[in-house]
Amino acid sequence: MVLFNRNLIISGIAGYFSGALGAQLYSMYDNNMLVNAIVALLSEYCVDIPFFVITFYIDNKYGHHDPIVGKKNQAFSKQNIKNLVIAISVSEAFYAVTKIFTHYQFLHHAMEPYQAAMASSLIAWTIFIVLVNVIGKKIKLFHK
């Protein structure tokens, strides 16, 4: 669980700053607040997802070995990836809705786009981290 959360946080920090940059740069070209919120979210995803995949792969490329046989346990790895996709997909849906809604609201209250992106990311990340960990525990994603 610690490595999983560490990977999410590392990728989230990278996405956090790219979302703020994307929102601010988009605001120079157009004032559409909803599109600005969507651009910020997409900017985050363009950095966040690749970072998570890379850090997760590095941490797990030698994991899940069967100590008796000495080979990688393919069935366990596939089940673990399936559970990971479930936990992250559900949590990401909540993240995206929360992020876009709060970003849009902050822009309506005259926040700078980069500030709106950062504040909305913090709110959405709080919900995401709690939700992904609760779901992960329920579907037994984390093993001892």
Kindly label every feature range from the protein language model:
Residues 1-144:
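Juxtamembrane/disordered regions of integral membrane proteins
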